[in-house]
Amino acid sequence: MKKYAVLHEPGDIVTLAGTRFVVLDVERRGSLPDSLFLLALESVGASEFGSSNNYAESDLKKAVDKWLEDMGKRGLDNAKLIPREIDLTTLDGSGCYGKLSVKAAPLTLDEAREYADIIPIAERWCWLATGWSGPSKSDGNYALNVYSSGDWYSSGCSGSYGVRPALKAPSILFEDSEAGLDLSKIPTDE
C-alpha cells in the first residue's frame, strides 16, 4: 500500500466540508494512512449540555451528531473518520460515565490540557465533554466549558454554550482530489 505523507503539522489550519479546523496532533499509524486530530476553529453552533453532565446521554452529544450528519451532506465522507475513545471521568475523578467511542465530540478536559498551547481561543464560550463531578454530588449537574478568554469554568448543564467538535481524519482526506484516488479503498481501522 502506498504511504501518504502528512502535509500538515500541529497548529496548521485546514478545511473539511467548509469548516475550518486547527490541527492538534498527527498520529502515525504504521501501514495505515496517518491521521490528523482536528478541533473546529470556532463554535459550529450552540447547545445546552443536557439534563445531566453525562456527555454520552447529553443534548450536546446530539448536537455534535447532528453537526456531523450535516457535514456529510456538505461532502465529508463520515465513514472515513477515525473513531476516538474519550474518557468521561469527571473533574473530581468519578469514573461512573466510563469511556465512549465517538467520531466527533468536544474535547475532554484532559485533551484540552494536553493541547492547550496549540488551541486557539474561540470567540464564544464552548462546552468540553467533561462533567464537574459525579451525579450523586450536589454539583453533579455542572460541566466544564471554555470561556472566550481561554479560561476553563464550570456551568450548569442547562446553559447554552458553543459546540466545538474535535475529530480524527485520515491524511488521505487532504490529498489533492485531482489525483483520482478512490477513498473507498483506504482503510480506517487500526
Where are these regions (language model features)?
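Collagenous Gly-X-Y triple-helix signature in extracellular proteins
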Residues: M1-E190
